[in-house]
Amino acid sequence: MFENIIKNVHNRHPLIHCITNYVSINDCANIVLACGGAPIMAEDINEVSQITSICQGLDINIGMLNDNKLSSMLKAGATANELGIPVILDPVGAGSSDYRIKAVQNLMSNVQFGVIRGIKAIAAKQGIHNIAAGVYDTMQKDKSAMGVEAGIADKITDDNIKEMADFINKLSQKTGAVIAVTGGIDMVADENRVYAIRNGHKMMSLVTGAGCQLSALTSAYVAADKEHILESVCAAVSVMGISGELAYRRMAEVDGNASYRNYIIDAVYNMTDDTLKELGRIERI
């Protein structure tokens, strides 16, 4: 099911509009280039609609949010929905302030996302009957997602994997989006299927913005094959994890987390479908 996904990205060179945060913007641009896509990082409200209209994917990341950027995200998202361009949401630190909570509620109420990545603060509790309407109340009760790396995937273990698969599957059904959570065990789900992915290395937690890079990478993969979003997201998550593993193998005694970050991007650049097939640990739940 994952044949030629990486080849497709290199052949189609999707243009990805990233409205992301300044901490990781350079790495996000570079990882899109490394995988075979092309990034554009425009965020002014006077041009975002036009920029989105010429792109094949839109990546929205709320890591460094403000009113102007939020307005641009809403406008770009509306254009993408109108034109059938897949939209990725990375709600970084969504539960860390009332402002972010309301911003995510606004985005989810007005933009149809193809993929939602990193959902701790949006859906930390089961029993939400309407995600968009219920975001605020849910987040008010669970403000533990304070950092970039927080996520419910921290709680996914072999003992509860079936339960978590059911939970994430229900979130996909409620939002209409493919849901991706990353941690010790990664999970990706659409309305009918759930996959667990067991790639990655613990040193990735020392790279600020690794999750932001994954969202940008995911946007490129999905844009290259938007008819198979679930498969594209699974591949992106696995590729990022494999790249973390391969990067760690390159580490010399004098190397630190900055070298490791660069090695991850190098691994994405050199990734092939054969490498994904050989090293990807993707299983259906």
Stretches with model-predicted labels:
Residues 197-208:
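Short pre-catalytic strand/loop immediately N-terminal to key active-site residues, enriched for Gly-Thr
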Residues 242-285:
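Charged C-terminal helix
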